[in-house]
Amino acid sequence: MAVLLKLGVLCSGQGARALLLRSRVVRPAYVSAFLQDQPTQGRCGTQHIHLSPSHHSGSKAASLHWTSERVVSVLLLGLIPAGYLNPCSVVDYSLAAALTLHSHWGLGQVVTDYVHGDTLPKAARAGLLALSALTFAGLCYFNYHDVGICRAVAMLWKL
């Protein structure tokens, strides 16, 4: 019962305000330093709170890239059964483009996450771009001069 009474005092208008002002988390000095974008003294030294927005937070390019990755993934979910049910050159070339884009973006994230340094990431990205271009060219060549991706997979299943 005593706990409920203390909670009632804390949750009332003056009790909650007094609790917040006495708290180590929120103090008027911290609030004013936050509003002025000044460094404040923290537990482990000086902390600097930035009020300026990130240059990339409002970027439409990141949102568009994320959306296009999801569109290609959903497109692949539809193209794979379409290639099985109706193997034709349109589906073959669509699969070549979608598979190449999907693998390029996925491997690009691996390069971003695991390749560090000044020149090594640039070389890895250039190598990835060359690999993706060769993959697309190879799949298009296979579609044009041979049976195509869909029929090749069907022939492999018959083995």
UniProtKB/Swiss-Prot annotation:
Q: Which residues lie on this side of the membrane: Mitochondrial intermembrane?
A: 86-90, 143-159
Q: Which residues lie on this side of the membrane: Mitochondrial matrix?
A: 57-63, 112-120
Transmembrane portions of the chain: 64-85, 91-111, 121-142
- Biological pathway: Carbohydrate metabolism; tricarboxylic acid cycle
Electron transport is among the record's keywords: yes
Give the UniProt record's GO annotations in the biological process aspect. Answer: cellular response to hypoxia; mitochondrial electron transport, succinate to ubiquinone; proton motive force-driven mitochondrial ATP synthesis; regulation of catecholamine secretion; tricarboxylic acid cycle
UniProt GO cellular component terms:
mitochondrial inner membrane; mitochondrion; respiratory chain complex II (succinate dehydrogenase)
Q: Which PANTHER family does the UniProt record give? A: SUCCINATE DEHYDROGENASE, SUCCINATE DEHYDROGENASE [UBIQUINONE] CYTOCHROME B SMALL SUBUNIT, MITOCHONDRIAL
List the protein's name: Succinate dehydrogenase [ubiquinone] cytochrome b small subunit, mitochondrial
Q: Which organism is it from?
A: Mus musculus
